[in-house]
């Protein structure tokens, strides 16, 4: 299931990223990111996949709709072995 506009905005906020940060990470224009987040543009599947993959690589986990609505959370950092 593709990410939703709300999930993109929540994920960006969880990472404390600006629209510019996400645009630079994905190679997309800031206006594209903004238009997706405010619902003016649903985003084509390839664009949403690029956004999802970059956010996942940064530590975001996407939560499917399970009665409470779709959401995001940050992965717990893994402990380094000494």
Residue ranges and their predicted role:
Residues 10, 25, 41-43, 63:
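A charge-rich, low-complexity, intrinsically flexible signal that marks solvent-exposed coils, linkers
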Residues 1-3:
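A detector for short, charged/polar N-terminal pre-domain segments
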Residues 6-21, 77, 81:
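Short basic helix-loop element that most often maps to the first helix and adjoining turn
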């Amino acid at each position: 299931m593709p990410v939703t506009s709300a999930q993109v905005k929540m994920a960006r906020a969880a990472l404390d990223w600006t629209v510019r940060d996400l645009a630079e990470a994905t190679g997309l224009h800031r206006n594209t990111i903004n238009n997706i987040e405010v619902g003016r543009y649903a985003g084509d599947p390839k664009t949403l996949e690029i956004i999802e993959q970059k956010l996942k690589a940064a530590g975001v986990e996407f939560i499917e709709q399970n009665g409470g609505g779709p959401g995001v959370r940050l992965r717990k950092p893994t402990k380094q072995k000494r």
